Amino acid sequence: MEADIQLMRLIQEMRAEIHKLEKENQALRMKLTASSQRASGSGRESGDEREEEAPGQSPATLQGAVSTDAAPAVQEHQGNVMIVRRYSISSSVCSSAVNDPWKSGKSHPKSGILEGQRTLKSLACSPIKKQDMEEKVFATDSLTSNRTSQRASPEHVCGCRDKTKAVSFLLPMDMSSYSKNSSSLKHSPNQATNQLSIIAE
């Protein structure tokens, strides 16, 4: 019984609060309609003044006004363009691109493309640098194991690297599979350098 009485009191209190809020809401709506009517009245007066000033202007100035109104739409359309760039697999190019991001983004300084390019460059350069470090470690291991076979092979490797051209897209990698691949590269020092160039490219 006491619980029912408490629930009835809570319901009555909530109804009283609802009535208060409804009254406040109606008062605010009345104020809003009054202010919107005042704003519409002042807007009509300013619109009439503009219409009176418009016949005095020449058609050239009217065309200029139309062209300036159409310009932001063109800029918005340019802001939606996606720029795709191709980067070589060398750490020097990546470091220069990260140090000087304005070279690639001077054409669109006001758009939000620069921030996206900076993040893409930083993401692209970090796996490339890791791959270069692993290539250097593997190259030193293979140099110590078989120097005689490598004396004839660098020209062949350089020729192959000059001839082959590929477009690569660097995506976020799964670190577990990446570590497995790197460990398999490190534990196989008997591979030839031309196989290393094929894996790296």
UniProtKB/Swiss-Prot annotation:
Transmembrane region(s): none
Keyword terms: Coiled coil
Coiled coil: 4-38
Statement: the UniProt record of this protein carries the keyword Coiled coil: yes
Keyword Transferase annotated: no
Chain residue ranges for the region called Disordered: 28-72, 179-201
Composition-biased stretches (Low complexity): 179-188
Biased composition (Polar residues): 189-201
Official protein name in the record: Coiled-coil domain-containing protein 195
Organism encoding this protein: Homo sapiens
